């Protein structure tokens, strides 16, 4: 089984990578912005089934390069799990009021949380289609639910996760064709 874990260098992604190896993954691709600095690197790199790849989900050229590297290594992917995501970093913080919105922050969260996974799917398309059973998952958040928003706030994060949910639903429809 060939598996890609986008954002597998730490946290949830690292735990999923460990589980994938324990379950017998044949090839495991793990992406991180800086793989050598990722906590998972020292733990998982010695396993010859593991390949760490640099990936900046906000950079389309990086997404394309990662897709090309994986396509050059395996004929198909059986599992893709996108765990990279962001709520806050630096001056990007969850907004409490609409007056707190900043366009650059909103766009950055869209790039990380919503666009990264679907652009990666675009680059991996030949490895996703075919006669094999594929599972493509992206970690979202309950706050991405439109119907469950009773508290307000967190505009950029909520919107980016809602966009991710719609993009993944649309991708699933196309993959089923």
Q: Where in this protein do the model-derived segments appear?
A:
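Conserved Rossmann-fold cofactor-binding substructure of NAD(P)-dependent oxidoreductases
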Residues: 57-76
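A short helix-coil junction within the Rossmann-fold of NAD(P)-dependent oxidoreductases
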Residues: 23, 73-74, 90, 123-132
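Conserved glycine-rich Rossmann-like NAD(P)H-binding loop of the short-chain dehydrogenase/reductase
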Residues: 21-40
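A short, exposed helix-loop element centered on a Lys and neighboring polar residues
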Residues: 121-122, 169
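Conserved N-terminal Rossmann-fold NAD(P)-binding element of oxidoreductases
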Residues: 3-8
């Amino acid at each position: 089984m060939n598996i890609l874990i986008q954002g597998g260098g730490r946290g949830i992604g690292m735990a999923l990578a460990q589980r994938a190896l324990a379950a017998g993954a044949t090839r495991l691709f793990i992406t991180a912005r800086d793989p050598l600095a990722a906590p998972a690197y020292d733990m998982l790199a010695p396993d010859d089934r593991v390949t760490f790849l640099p990936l900046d989900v906000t950079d389309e050229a990086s997404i394309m390069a990662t897709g090309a590297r994986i396509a050059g290594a395996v004929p198909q992917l059986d599992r893709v799990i996108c765990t990279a995501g962001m709520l806050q970093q630096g001056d990007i913080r969850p907004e409490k009021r609409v007056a707190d919105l900043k366009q650059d922050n909103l766009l950055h969260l869209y790039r990380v949380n919503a666009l990264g996974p679907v652009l990666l799917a675009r680059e991996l398309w030949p490895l996703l289609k075919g006669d094999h059973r594929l599972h493509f998952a992206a970690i979202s958040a309950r706050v991405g639910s439109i119907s469950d928003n009773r508290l307000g706030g967190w505009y950029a994060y909520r919107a980016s996760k809602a966009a991710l949910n719609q993009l993944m639903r649309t991708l699933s429809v196309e993959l089923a064709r």
